[in-house]
Regions:
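Histone-fold recognition with a strong bias for associated Lys/Arg-rich disordered tails
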Residues: 1-178
């Protein structure tokens, strides 16, 4: 299996800054939990833990429960097999490679030039993996998530590495006067 660095570097130029950070955090979570492989639940937990990311608000907009997604992802990571006595090398699991490929495909189908966190969440909803079941259990479906992404993007594509960073800025730094 390929080392983490190789798979992530291969796609680095196509990832938004936020998604790159989430992948790094997923790797840190796998290391901290003594997991041999980085799995989709690590990445799901990483995006849910990002206070400045858009995952929680996107899930909420899609009618889901972000706290439940986060709690269930944490529980799933806690249940993963632990390996002790390794050199601290973690590898990308097959499921995560599959999801990253699906994520890239979702982004390309939408005309995005960069792969974003929201495309990862969307790709997950189309799989039979535990991370997908966590989203479904919290009320997130592919159809609802697609509608939420469309509403957040306002028809725009992700055209640069900072594409998802500025989206919630207006909401964050303004007061709703209605």
């Amino acid at each position: 299996r390929p080392k983490v660095r190789n798979v992530f570097e291969m796609r680095q130029d196509k990832l938004t800054t936020k998604f790159q950070q989430a992948l790094g955090e997923a790797q840190s979570l796998a290391l901290a939990h003594d997991n041999q492989y980085i799995e989709p639940v690590h990445l799901l937990l990483a995006v849910m833990n990002d206070q400045e990311g858009s995952a929680s608000s996107l899930i909420e907009r899609a009618g889901g429960n972000p706290k439940r997604v986060r709690d269930e992802a944490q529980a799933a990571v806690d249940r993963l097999p632990k390996v002790t006595g390794t050199s601290g090398d973690v590898q990308v699991g097959r499921d995560l490679i599959r999801v990253l490929n699906l994520t890239e495909k979702e982004a390309m189908q939408r005309g995005d030039q960069f792969i974003s966190t929201e495309m990862f969440l969307l790709a997950l909803t189309g799989t039979d993996m535990e991370a997908s079941r966590i989203l479904a259990g919290a009320g997130v479906t592919k159809k609802l998530l697609e509608a939420a992404i469309q509403a957040v993007r306002g028809g725009e594509n992700v055209t640069d590495a900072e594409g998802e960073s500025g989206r919630d800025a207006i909401k964050k730094y303004t007061v709703d006067l209605t």
